[in-house]
Amino acid sequence: MPEFEVTPWEVTGVVDYNKLIEEFGTTPLTDDLLKKTEELTKKELPMYFKRKFFFSHRDYDLVLKDYEAGKGFFLYTGRGPSGPMHIGHIIPFFATKWLQENFGVNLYVQITDDEKFLFKPQLTFEGTKRWAYENILDIIAVGFDPDKTFIFQDSEFTKIYEMAIPIAKKVTYSMAKAVFGFNEQSKIGMIFFPAIQAAPTFFEEKRSLIPAAIDQDPYWRIQRDFAESLGYYKTAALHSKFVPGLMGLGGKMSASKPETAIYLTDDPEEAGKKIWKYALTGGRATAKEQRELGGEPDKCVVFKWLEIFFEPDEKKLLERYIACKNGEILCGQCKRYLIEKVQNFLKEHQEKREKAKKEIEKFKYTGDLAREQWDKAIPEPLRK
């Protein structure tokens, strides 16, 4: 058995991200590229980049060169609406918001209600459409520019099918099978879907940049195989690490294991109880032992969550790390600190989520970018 495994559907074990870069054939996100990002945006990098939560890429160096040369680029990401969103789902959207805000670029968010219906036997099509609405509220609450962001559901934006047809003509079954592991039991809709997922990378005649967790990388490998034959750029990607569930550093937070996840719609008080009960710490067997030997923050989910998202202050994070190692603070103190941070985040997010109900039409239909996409003809290279 491998010590860890990463696929688009499952992540198991404690991931060695350096080995994963070798396995996937991606490139480390270097300090030089991060420095270049700071120079071009003239803004301090957010913690997701400074702390290497985003750690790997494909062609991000070319994205920065395009931007510097005045060619620009655009952002593309998405969400498969199979249930409620949790903290692990939303963090890449905050990084995407920073990129949109500081590079001033367009963003396309694909809501794959069709994919989830096809790939999840227990879901109905009406069910995935309902979850699409709920998930879109969470995405809008992040704070994207409504005139530079187009959020679309595949079941509504049927123009995407017309764009997917010439893409599907380029992709053989063996290519799709090699990436996704299709077999004789795979439904024909599943086999066609990669063409639909690739279509948004051709919305503009610029390079697209996809910020996403690295387990999603296989979806874009096919696009990179044929994009240039259609007269477009290979898509670029920024890969994030995984947000661990509450009960351990292995794998990733999973919506199918409610005790490991904090959902964006959780009652803040209940979320606090969940963290207190389930969050794994790097503590010793007794308080006395911890004061003598110190804690182990590198094995601690509580510290990892602070590092990834909930403690933006570098000085405070380092002080907490050292205090833990020196036995100066106990696990209960850190749990209470994290609970307060998470509860404040949930309260603020849920207020913004409620306001998003009045903004959803602009993101989907009436904003500048949305209107442009609904009115636009199919790009010429895809009509040949």
UniProtKB/Swiss-Prot annotation:
Q: Which UniProt keywords apply?
A: Aminoacyl-tRNA synthetase, ATP-binding, Cytoplasm, Ligase, Nucleotide-binding, Protein biosynthesis
Locate the motif 'KMSKS' region. Answer: 252-256
Q: Which reaction does it catalyse?
A: tRNA(Trp) + L-tryptophan + ATP = L-tryptophyl-tRNA(Trp) + AMP + diphosphate + H(+)
> Broadest EC class?
ligase
PROSITE patterns in the record, alphabetically? AA_TRNA_LIGASE_I
**Pfam entry (one):** tRNA-synt_1b
Which Gene Ontology cellular component annotation is one that this UniProt entry carries? cytoplasm
Tell me a Gene Ontology molecular-function term this record carries: ATP binding
Its family remark reads: Belongs to the class-I aminoacyl-tRNA synthetase family.
- What protein name applies here? Tryptophan--tRNA ligase
- Gene assigned in the entry: trpS
